[in-house]
Amino acid sequence: MKSLGFQQFKQIHMIGIGGSGMIGVATILQKRGFSVTGSDLSITPEVRDLKKLGSKVQIGHEPHLIKKADLVVASSAISSRNPELVFAKKSNITIIPRAEMLGTLMKPYRSIAVAGSHGKTTTTSIIASIFNGAGLSPTYVIGGQVLSVGRSSNLGDGSYMIVEADESDGSFLHLQPEVAVITNIDNDHLDFYESSQEKLNQSFVNFAENLPFYGHLILNLDDSNINKIKKNIHRKIISFGFSSKNQFQIINTALHEGVQNFQLLNTHSKKLYKFSTSLSGRHNLLNVCAAICVALEEKISIINIKKGLKNFKGVGRRFEIAEISISGQSKILIDDYGHHPTEILATLKASKEKFSTKRICMIFEPHRFSRTKHLFEDFVKVLTQIDQLLLLDIYPASESPIRGISSKNLMAKINQNNGNAILVSNSSAQQWIEENYNDYDVLLTQGAGTISQLNHSIKEKWTLKK
């Protein structure tokens, strides 16, 4: 394993260590022999696993925690007023953002990064599964738990590093991968990009141009925003999607006993490949296809690609299916991280495709006041399509409330448009579920805030079938 260029920094402290982007980086650093400490507001199962590796993690943020640190790595969610960050600045301790550390960790490897508004966690995980299946033992850092291995990161023995690239705060520009995927570009995180879709699009151009001249860029040309930026990218492009304008075109899709079968046509060479996936939804066919394109570019055999797809069991909180039993009645419970209207619609379509005759009840926790404001009408359009909607309060994610933006107002607009929404809390949601279990067959917990805790409580309360 090649050495890193910052071995002199023995003691590394990570502020916000439990975040989905931080935990994987911390794990890799600890396994690479660094002494890692960290702080956060709560201890998650992932943090407990990190502590088992030897990392010291404290609840709360206190200046004394970093007195022995040589280097501080800060999550983008951390305020500039954080007491640890303030102390580090006064003490002239080197401070870097998480993405800069991730980019540094990538340098000794042949690196692959997956960016995009939607699908990047799933796509990154599929790539890791395929490379594992091919015996390449990749190192990877992903923003969700890979269910087949029960973790979001791995320090492998091979020459590849596979990472998820986060565009939400522009930090993916710290990465310089040799192979990159852009799954799609949607109108999300516009609060950071000054409400400008053009600025968001340009950030993806800049990300693509970070590739070396010999790098490969894999694009979904079905996406309108990607088509807009393509002319400004000067790297080798491999395209994928359902349209015939793509180099790799998805054709002849068929659903059989919960498995999606499809063919992939190389429109240049006319080669035709047959694949299948247990993942649900049209959006996941695009995710799978992106991963296949990466594998083909890296000369992985079709046999090993199919092996990796077969071994892939999904990602935590990405259309994660379980069964519960309420008063002797079996119900489907789906947990999904999606919090943008496009993602919610994809989840809803996948649910209806997989459980076509079932009635769906969704519990949705809107994420951020700014997102709810920017996409208010889009949320209304999607959420009116749900048989029964239970709305939790907006999860602020450190934002201040915005006048006129609330779950109550969202509910009113949904119901004005012939939707069926009610306001609930975590506790009253469980009560409603128990009292109305005859009225639905599929229960969906949807969102990126604390709703995963509600899903866990539902599983705890009602028997989970093995």
Regions from the language model: what does each represent?
Residues 39-40, 58-61, 96-100, 141-144, ...:
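Beta-strand->loop->alpha-helix junctions that form or flank phosphate-binding loops
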Residues 35-49:
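NAD(P)-binding Rossmann-fold cofactor-contacting core
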Residues 56-68, 427-433:
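Short acidic low-complexity segments
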Residues 38, 140, 180, 219, ...:
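Structural beta-sheet core signal
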Residues 332, 380-439:
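C-terminal helical cap/extension that packs against the catalytic core
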Residues 2-13, 21, 25-28, 32, ...:
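Nucleotide phosphate-binding/pyrophosphate-handling subdomain across enzymes
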Residues 4-5, 14, 21, 28-34, ...:
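Phosphate-binding loop of NTP-binding sites
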Residues 12-17, 446:
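Conserved N-terminal Rossmann-fold NAD(P)-binding element of oxidoreductases
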